[in-house]
């Protein structure tokens, strides 16, 4: 069983390796969302698919990827494009790139009728894109076996999501399903899980030191 302490220790290890010049490619590190991610994974089965973006180390560990295997892949420059089909993990480093892929996988699972589910992790800014909106609505209309997990840290890189989009009313964002501060919301009818978190430990990319590849 992977614990919160395991997740934190892994990212700290990767941060030290990156700052030491051992990783010759970008990394995106997580912090502050350990409890929420662990909670979401309580419902994810081994045969389910997990789809995500470039910040994916937590979900890989919780899906069962061995720590040393994941570390090897990161050292080989694969942090942003973690596709491990044997563990049913698919990631995309393109903003808004994963929703359509996840939707396609969900269609395939529905046709196979084997009871498997797709869980797609996206950030709040990605969830504000047309690509997400189309895939999310499509999955509801066709009742696909997929759940969208929106991880809201309030920004894209350093751009505040709500400011950037000019949101003035809570219904214009996912605030309308947010019921408690620093909580996690399960919106089953809309195939959605939503939570907020703050990452004050790591920058958007890298680990806080300028590293020349």
Set out the residue ranges of the language-model regions.
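Alpha-helical protein-protein interaction elements
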Residues: 2, 124, 130, 178, ...
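Thiamine diphosphate
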Residues: 142-213
């Amino acid at each position: 069983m992977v614990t919160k302490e395991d997740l934190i220790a892994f990212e700290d290890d990767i941060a030290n390796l990156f700052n030491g010049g051992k990783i010759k490619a970008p990394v995106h590190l997580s912090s502050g969302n350990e409890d929420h991610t662990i909670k979401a994974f309580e419902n994810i089965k081994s045969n389910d698919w997990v789809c995500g973006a470039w910040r994916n180390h937590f979900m890989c560990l919780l899906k069962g990827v061995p720590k040393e295997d994941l570390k090897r892949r990161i050292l080989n420059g694969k942090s942003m494009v973690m596709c491990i089909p044997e563990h049913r993990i698919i990631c995309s480093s393109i903003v808004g790139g994963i929703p359509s892929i996840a939707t396609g996988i969900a269609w395939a699972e529905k046709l196979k009728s084997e009871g498997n589910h797709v869980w797609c992790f996206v950030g709040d800014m990605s969830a504000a894109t047309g690509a997400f909106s189309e895939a999310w609505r499509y999955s509801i209309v066709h009742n696909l076996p997929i759940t969208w997990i929106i991880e809201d840290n309030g920004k894209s890189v350093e751009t505040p999501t709500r400011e950037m989009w000019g949101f003035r009313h809570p219904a214009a964002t996912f605030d309308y399903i947010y019921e408690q501060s620093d909580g996690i919301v399960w919106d089953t009818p809309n195939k959605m899980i939503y939570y907020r978190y703050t990452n004050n430990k790591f920058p958007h990319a890298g680990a806080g030191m300028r590293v020349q590849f």
